[in-house]
Amino acid sequence: MGQSLHALLRDVGLELPAGLADPQLTSITSDSRLVGEGSLFLGLPGERFDGGRFWRQALEAGAAAAVIGPSAAQELPPAADQPVLVLREPVARSIGELAASYWGHPCRRMALIGVTGTNGKTTTTHLIEHLAVRVGQPTALFGTLVNRWPGYSITATHTTSVADRLQAQLAEAASAGSQLAAMEVSSHALVQERVAGCRFAGAVFTNLTQDHLDYHGTMESYYEAKARLFTAPLLDGDGPSAVVNGDDPWGSRLAEQLGGRCWRSSLGDPQAELQMVDLEMTGQGVRGRLLSPAGSGAFCSPLLGRFNLMNLLQAVGVLLQRGLPLAPLLEAVGSFRGVPGRMERVVVNGAESAALPTVLVDYAHTPDGLENALAASRPFTDGRLVCVFGCGGDRDRGKRPQMAAIAARLADRVVVTSDNPRTEDPDQIIADVVAGMPSGTDLSVERDRATAIAEAIADASAADLVLIAGKGHEDYQILGTEKVHFDDREEAEQALRQRQ
């Protein structure tokens, strides 16, 4: 961007060490392997190791300077004449601000909307993108599945990228003409300051249910992480700029904290600013009326499930806060067909068949997500509801018996299998799940996920519905430390073909 080191440091309020040279910077990066002549190396502290420890390698590779944290400086103290700036804590926040400044503060050039919550982030951000584009506003999307903007698209590797890469992507999106951007913001990203340097014009809280307690420890800590998105300097301003799920107990708490700065969304509270009424569920989706401070109107959506109504309500609501017109937004709702791996129907040769069971693949991997997916599936079967699921290894063990109890309560038949066991013993994970099943559950256990899917579909009648939960869009399994190709949709389609 042609910025000098001194100008960059001054822009974010950092003190200049005496004698520090003022070169023109050619790039910034937190990856020492990407350093070139004139780069600024950002020594980003991480969970497993401190990237600041690589400052020497960065300088040897031609970096003009390096910024590191106190722990890296203590471990490998730089000499007084070396161009190394030691930051005060929180280091990651300063690095995010540096990245935003280097890339010209991209959030000042387009309106950034952040979506956080346990479930619903992906569908809600995709809805925001779809609706905004349909009403003529070029929009970028950052999330679990893909990062894209006008003229560019790439499969995402993380829900929220590290700060320097994120700011570079935001700058590219703004330069490509994006007027708005929808971003999934994970709790990990908020704790690790990956979105430092961002300024959000709007924010959405979808819900909070048990997940990631292996990382956060308690639900209170998990909530506090999510709530960071709704505080300055990330989200600021006097008027309504947030949409919060008022039907969620944690959302109700957040709404009370935010007061007039948020609109509450609800499917049952007549006092909420955003509501849906006169709902009619059909085999083709749902129709009803949306009520908002900007007016009301009828809508028709092909999305399945009550939980998707909340996603839709919140997406429309946050765009209304941005001043987009209600009528065109509601018209655009009907053309949104959903997100890959979210209540996605698997068919053979692109066509449904009355001779085959209905098969849905969903990313549900939390207790709340599984309950929502099963509840949404029930109206679409005249036969049995069969649930195939497992729980990930090296993750929150407390949700395993909870998911088991939900599956046993809402499904007619349950098949427990593997789901990214990672370095845990798959049989022990399955045992943890089965321990939560009440006696009398119609239960099968099959460690091999492909076999479990094939047998569940082979055993199902044409009137049954088979829900394959947990992986959704993912096209891999993590076995030990190895990632191997695996796609629930491919396995399900193959099993359906065997039925023809």
From Swiss-Prot:
- Pathway connected to this protein: Cell wall biogenesis; peptidoglycan biosynthesis
Q: Which InterPro entries match?
A: Mur-like_cat_sf, Mur_ligase_C, Mur_ligase_C_dom_sf, Mur_ligase_cen, Mur_ligase_N, MurE/MurF_N, UDP-N-AcMur-Glu-dNH2Pim_ligase
Q: Which residues form a coiled coil?
A: none
A GO term from the CC aspect: cytoplasm
Q: Which organism is it from?
A: Parasynechococcus marenigrum (strain WH8102)
Tell me where in this chain the PTM N6-carboxylysine is found.
K226
Q: Which residues bind UDP-N-acetyl-alpha-D-muramoyl-L-alanyl-D-glutamate?
A: S32, T159, T160, S186, Q192, R194
- Function noted in UniProt: Catalyzes the addition of meso-diaminopimelic acid to the nucleotide precursor UDP-N-acetylmuramoyl-L-alanyl-D-glutamate (UMAG) in the biosynthesis of bacterial cell-wall peptidoglycan.
Pfam families named among the record's database cross-references? Mur_ligase, Mur_ligase_C, Mur_ligase_M
Cellular compartment(s): Cytoplasm
Record: residues binding ATP: G117, T118, N119, G120, K121, T122, T123
Q: Superkingdom of the source?
A: Bacteria
Encoding gene, per UniProt annotation: murE
Q: Where is this motif: Meso-diaminopimelate recognition motif?
A: 419-422
What name appears for this protein in its UniProt entry? UDP-N-acetylmuramoyl-L-alanyl-D-glutamate--2,6-diaminopimelate ligase
**What does it catalyze?**
UDP-N-acetyl-alpha-D-muramoyl-L-alanyl-D-glutamate + meso-2,6-diaminopimelate + ATP = UDP-N-acetyl-alpha-D-muramoyl-L-alanyl-gamma-D-glutamyl-meso-2,6-diaminopimelate + ADP + phosphate + H(+)
One GO molecular function term of this record is:
ATP binding
Cofactor (UniProt): Mg(2+)
Q: How is it modified after translation?
A: Carboxylation is probably crucial for Mg(2+) binding and, consequently, for the gamma-phosphate positioning of ATP.
